């Protein structure tokens, strides 16, 4: 399936192929060891999760939308 992955910075938005949204979040975690992913919110075809620094400061939000 194709997913649109967005952040607060529109230049970082990408389309990714994945089996499900959890694969995208896990890939993000592997590639960004300095960040923590907070609670995951899912409603219909949209998944959102907050991204925090290792010190607990809010940095960004990932929004994953099924295409």
Model segments located where?
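Short aromatic-glycine-(Arg/Gly/Cys) micro-motifs in beta-strand/loop hairpins
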Residues: 1-12
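A short, exposed loop/beta-hairpin motif centered on an aromatic-Gly-Thr core
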Residues: 10-20
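Short acidic, gly/pro-rich beta-turn/loop elements at beta-sheet edges
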Residues: 15, 28, 59-61
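A short, charged, amphipathic alpha-helix used as a generic interaction element across diverse proteins
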Residues: 18-41
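Short, mixed-charge low-complexity intrinsically disordered segments
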Residues: 33-67
